[in-house]
Design a protein with these regions (language model features):
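A charged, aromatic-enriched C-terminal amphipathic alpha-helix characteristic of glycosyltransferases
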Residues: 318-352
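Membrane-proximal helix-turn-helix segments that form the acceptor-binding/catalytic region
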Residues: 71-75, 99-118
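Acidic anion/phosphate-binding donor-loop and adjacent secondary structure
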Residues: 144-164, 345, 354-355
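Nucleotide-activated donor-binding/catalytic signature segment of Leloir-type glycosyltransferases, i.e.
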Residues: 205, 213-248
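Conserved donor-binding/catalytic core segment of Leloir-type glycosyltransferases
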Residues: 4, 158-187, 202
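Nucleotide-sugar-dependent
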Residues: 61, 177, 233-275, 281-292
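Conserved acidic donor-binding segment of nucleotide-sugar-dependent glycosyltransferases
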Residues: 292-304, 312-318
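Carbohydrate-associated surface elements
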Residues: 125, 143
Length: 358
């Protein structure tokens, strides 16, 4: 089986988890050969004849010539799977909305979803979003490759920890409405006698000079009213190293505001922190409800419970240890890349066989 994966030169977190890492593992098999291309526009038919299947994230044409490229691929008869990890409909306040509209990104993704032989998504909810556009939609959930360096424990980083309980969050510029959920709890932490001076907050993914990240920092420091010893930031890293920040965390915060956009996300952040044996507190919202077992592998919180749950993990080290171990075992046993790749390969074979019968 010869597969062509199409992804950008600069690998995003999405392509890392959905294409590069799964296919790298699959490529270790003697029965599968994976080839990577960054742009497949304007290539001769003979190039595509060597492959049984194309897999691409969101769109096939990275140059924006969707209809032209799809016409060629349909004529050749090579099957195509489009992978999508969240919704293509951005809310009006999304930081990328203006660029999304000017480039007609949503329309391009919609067209690709309609044309594909099959679509891979991360959750059942997202599958329901795609199904009106393409009935051949399959849930291939996110998973962790424990052989990747960033998902191995880094003892050097662990030795750098201070005496404080380290409480961290990691993300991008698109999460302001999620972090607002934590603002009041951070204020309470600094004044509660059972928690003050016992913790340090870590903001991971920081981009110097970005106004949104300064706003994030304002939330984490309660308006710069906590001491320097109780806050630190970790600069943004690439897709191959960002999870190394979790080695600094004792407690991971995963807030998520319930919105139509957020319901299309996956449980990936919880899987990542679980793989690094971090005890986590998650919003009691979909998609985390897929794997979250409150008081067993995490603590769940509604918008009024964040302080209570954070305080609980600061003051109860045995609970931190129990939750982190249980979540690690859940991820290791049920959300490892080898197990999920069995579903992925089964789908690939099914799509190729169906195409050969046409």
């Amino acid at each position: 089986m010869k597969i062509l994966q199409v992804c950008d030169k600069k690998i995003s977190g999405v392509e890392y988890h959905r294409l590069l890492i799964p296919h790298g593992k699959i490529n270790e098999s003697e029965e599968v050969e994976i080839t990577t291309a960054h742009i497949i526009d304007h290539l001769p038919d003979s190039f595509f004849h060597q492959f049984d299947l194309i897999v691409s994230s969101s769109v096939v044409s990275k140059m924006g010539f969707q209809e032209i490229l799809w016409k060629q691929l349909k004529r050749i008869g090579i099957p195509v799977i489009i992978d999508r990890d969240d919704t293509w409909v951005l809310p009006h306040n999304h930081p990328l909305k203006k660029d999304w509209v000017s480039k007609k990104t949503a329309q391009q993704i919609t067209y690709n979803l309609q044309q594909a032989n099959a679509v891979m998504v991360t959750t059942e909810h997202l599958a329901n979003m795609v199904s009106p556009l393409n009935k051949n939609v399959y849930v291939i959930p996110n998973a962790i490759d424990f052989s990747q360096d960033q998902f191995k424990p880094d003892l050097k980083v662990k030795r750098m920890k201070t005496g404080h309980i380290q409480i961290g969050w990691s993300g991008s510029v698109t999460h302001h409405h999620d972090l607002v959920l934590l603002a009041e709890s951070f204020l309470q932490l600094k004044s509660d006698p059972d928690t003050q001076n016992k913790y340090r907050l870590i903001l991971s993914g920081f981009i110097e000079g970005d106004a949104m990240w300064k706003e994030y920092e304002n939330i984490f420091t309660s308006g710069y009213r906590i001491s320097q010893e109780q806050y630190c930031r970790i600069n943004g890293m690439d897709a191959f190293t960002y999870a190394s920040a979790y080695d600094m965390f004792d407690i991971g915060l995963i807030p998520l505001k319930d919105t139509p956009f957020n319901r299309c996300k996956s449980e990936l952040k919880m899987l990542e922190m679980g793989a690094k044996k971090v005890s986590v507190i998650v919003s009691d919202e979909y998609p985390y409800t897929n794997i979250a077992k409150n008081k067993k592998n995490c603590l769940a919180a509604n918008k009024k419970e964040w302080f209570k749950q954070i305080k609980k993990l600061i003051t109860l080290p045995e609970l931190r240890s129990e939750l982190s171990e249980n979540l690690y075992n859940e991820v290791k046993e049920n959300h490892n890349i080898e197990k999920v790749n069995e579903l992925r390969l089964e789908l690939y074979k099914e799509v190729i066989n169906a195409s050969n019968k046409v």
